Swiss-Prot record:
Belongs to the universal ribosomal protein uS14 family. The gene is rpsN. GO terms for cellular component: cytoplasm; small ribosomal subunit. NCBIfam families: PRK08881.1. Gene3D superfamilies: 1.10.287.1480. This is Small ribosomal subunit protein uS14. GO terms for molecular function: rRNA binding; structural constituent of ribosome. It comes from Photobacterium profundum (strain SS9). GO terms for biological process: translation. Keywords: Ribonucleoprotein, Ribosomal protein, RNA-binding, rRNA-binding. Binds 16S rRNA, required for the assembly of 30S particles and may also be responsible for determining the conformation of the 16S rRNA at the A site. Part of the 30S ribosomal subunit. Contacts proteins S3 and S10. The lineage of its organism: Bacteria, Pseudomonadati, Pseudomonadota, Gammaproteobacteria, Vibrionales. InterPro entries: Ribosomal_uS14, Ribosomal_uS14_bac/plastid, Ribosomal_uS14_CS.
Amino acid sequence: MAKESMKAREAKRAKLVAKFAEKRAALKVIISDVNASEEDRWNAVLKLQSLPRDSSSSRQRNRCNQTGRPHGYLRKFGLSRIKVRETCMKGEIPGLRKASW
């Protein structure tokens, strides 16, 4: 189980990403715009750098919904490999069963 503080930190990051998403996107459009002046582009870069680090979506980490485990995360289920196996063996995931050939 992950520490509660780690889960809380990820939740905080998710809120910051949602809060600053539009602002970051607008600044990135200005930065990548070839027709914008160098001064405007530079100012956009400075404004982007002044935003909180945790507002970047690349700082988010996928975590298991049940345990908070960061490694072995399966996007399709939102769970770690361990919890997917446990729930599969109990028959709690419809249509999923152990492979045998």
